[in-house]
Amino acid sequence: MSNDRLLQNVVSILLMTGYNVSERCEIRPRSFDLMTSKGENLLVIKVVSQIDSVNEDIAWDLDKIARHLHAVPLIIGERARDVALERGAIYLRYGINAVSSATLYDYLAEGELPLVYASPGGLYVNIDAERLRTLREEQAMSLGDLAHALGVSRRTISKYEGGMGTTLEMAMRLEEFFNDDIVMPIDLLHYTPAEEEHVPASLASGHNPESDAQPKRPEDHLRSIGINVQELRRAPFHAFAMFENKTILTCYGSPQKTVQRAELVGNISQITGTHSLCVVSDYRKEKKIGKTLVIGEERLKNVEDGEDLLEMVTEEK
């Protein structure tokens, strides 16, 4: 299946299950293809045929977007190392969940949570460690007793009760032995970023958006007036500008690329409940394109503080 058909399939699943879906991101390079929301759930989605094509730089962007928008990053694909993704299984790319479109459908449309995850060596499941310990103790079995019954070491059983995952085969043996459910399903809409953000070695400090390198003045000025600026590498917006619990999706560029970028970023801001701003070089006007405020660099220099900027981006033109 081509990337376009796969993307259309994903959009159909999202719309069918009641999600609001952003316009497709056509700007290159791009770390994601869609933003989608339903209630309190916000997803940032990358669609690729081969999930191995998602490199560390893209994953870093996905994680950073998820952190700042309280979203869930998700990769939808078909294959990993030329092997089809198993339906109902979760794969990982640099800490980001990756699933097939069929698994996405099962989760969103049928309410079926994945049970297995792929790891070197095969498919594994998470065990309800507390439930396993309770079942063993209810039958007055020691760690050694259970280990002997299953033909594994005492240390292995201890690790299971400590939260270590196991193979699908062993999980089935445990459930058959106790005649009870101990496998824990995996919630696709749950994402916990690592405590410390990992920055790939390939990412230099500062934003280096495209080959026609953009000037640093816009983000430098935003920082100078007390706005927290968090830059991205491959998103259609170049940075999050944050002030007083408000987030502005911010992009910089030349007039030639402004209209397409401004319309897309404005659409994304509606899905994510944020605001949007494009700062354009050699530009003298101030107007709205869709939901995005478009101003020139000189106008930005006259913005004195974050409150002034928030008032500008929220004002209807």
UniProtKB/Swiss-Prot annotation:
Gene3D superfamilies in alphabetical order: lambda repressor-like DNA-binding domains (1.10.260.40)
Region (Disordered): 199-219
CDD domains membership: HTH_XRE
InterPro entries, per the entry: Arc_TR_HTH, Cro/C1-type_HTH, Lambda_DNA-bd_dom_sf
Record-annotated HTH cro/C1-type domain positions: 132-189
DNA-binding region: 143-162
Molecular functions (GO terms): DNA binding; DNA-binding transcription factor activity
PROSITE patterns linked: HTH_CROC1 (PS50943)
Keyword Cell membrane: no
Biased composition (Basic and acidic residues): 209-219
Keywords of the record: DNA-binding, Transcription, Transcription regulation
Superkingdom of origin: Archaea
NCBIfam families named in the record: PRK04140.1
Protein name stated in the entry: Putative HTH-type transcriptional regulatory protein Mlab_0160
Species assigned in the record: Methanocorpusculum labreanum (strain ATCC 43576 / DSM 4855 / Z)
